[in-house]
Amino acid sequence: MKKQKKNKQEDSVLPKQLNRRQFLEKLGISAAAGISLLSPGKARADNFRFNEASRARKGDRLHSRAAARAYRSANVKHPNNGEEDDFPYLFNYTKSLPHDSTTGEVVPRAYDRYIAALKKNNFDALENIGTGFRPLENPQAGLALPISGMDHQRYKMPPAPRVDKAQHSAEMIELYWQALCRDINFTDFDDDVTVNEAASELSSLSGYAGPRINSSVSPACVFRGNFFGDLSGPFVSQFLLQDISFGAHTIVQRLTRAYPSGTDYMTDFDDWLFIQQGNNFKNDPDYDSTPRYIRNGRDLASYVYEDELYQAYLNAAAWLLEEEAILDSGNPYHRLAATSNYVNFGPKRILCSVSDVSMLALQAVFFQKWFVHRRQRPEEFGGRIHQHITGARDYSMIHDDVLNSEAVAKVFTNNGSYLLPQVYRQGSPTHPAYGAGHATVAGACVTVLKAFFDETYIVKNPVVANSDGTALVPYTGADKNSLTVGGELNKLAANIAIGRNWAGIHWRTDYTESMELGEKIAIQMLRTQAMQYPERHSFSFTRFNGSPITIRGRGFK
């Protein structure tokens, strides 16, 4: 990875493009004169000792201010959507708990024991819940106390859409359509019949909250993200396609563990129930043997199954550093010549910030998952739809739109069931859907990157995958010369978050609301970190809602 440049070339920030030697000569300062200033006895280490008591007082004030910011107004109310009370045991997360072998519903006593254990929030109670082969994933993560940013329990998320409302139905219909469109190349969307049918039905739904163009859903915007940049350029962000120089290595972004086309799971009720009971298939799936660039929804789903927590954003940071993308104008080293931003505000800080914020984001969203919302996974709701339409159970509280959906009917024609087809054999992870871990981390990490880099910087030479994903070809769209760092970072976050929707394991609001949660977490972390730097600085960027924000650090002596 190249050393990050302050603007373009390190010496280019000096007056009239002078290099350092010319700059010193212009000031009349010779190398010898510079050396003579360091007379014996003047540069002893003793002269550089700091007042330890003063520094301790500064540190104590900093920690006190940070703690006050993190924990003030800690008594925050966290409402959920009320389904747990209104429709007990039916529409909340229950995967890996014991289920009735006929109805597919959770055993009530098991659910009550699970809720009681969460309220006690200790290891012994959680260990005695009784689950299948797959354990519940880390309920106590959301109880961790942060030492940077704000307390996890001060962040709020709105209640998730309810099963008896149009928005919930629209989100499920979108997932059925995504299952039907998984193997269609993004570059073929405009002319594909199924994609056009999907856009048409989604456009007709009053509860659909995805992007629209001129009030309609079209192939140009269907299944894309909701924020700035998501509708510009190719479907896939450049940060998921272009090669990345990472230290002494070059990362070629072909997938080597991708699910093959046409392979869906959990389309049979017995298989579905087997997975809901917490079981798992012993054998790994057969992956596509040909390395491919991301070209369709199944490829995106494959990426977000194998990715590490902040992999995509660390890669994006490395790409931006290698490309010498311009830093944010508030970076204190933006126009300095004698000192550089090697640690503070430079490559090391940027890379570490992506890691730092990702853990804060994950812990915060796990509090929302387990202790507030406990939203059902889409695959679980698919079981309710199947049982209702086949007449095995009566769930008349489900909003009619999804029960009468063209997408649901097409899935039945293909598979002989109304279950939501899954990309992964085991379906979702064993933790609730809302908020989404991938989406919260995405929102947090791209916010950090937008804070450090100039969002308006143009991404050069955009590319797309060819038809079989084996190579990259130039993107030739009309906007090929106007794709920005800010837009492509937002798109990267959408690709990762909605990639989980392509797999069938998350909802659209899991993406949208979690992105904004992640953004809040990143902002608070940046504000806390701003107090620790001696340099006066600022970060300016655009929030997901389109509003500008500036975070300032006053510095200290």
Residues covered by each model-derived region:
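Hydrophobic alpha-helical bundle signature of multipass membrane enzymes
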Residues: L38, R44-F556
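N-terminal twin-arginine translocation
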Residues: K16-E25, A33-F48
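N-terminal secretory signal peptides
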Residues: M1-N19, R44
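Intrinsically disordered, low-complexity segments enriched in polar/charged small residues
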Residues: V13-L14, E25-K26, A31, G443, ...
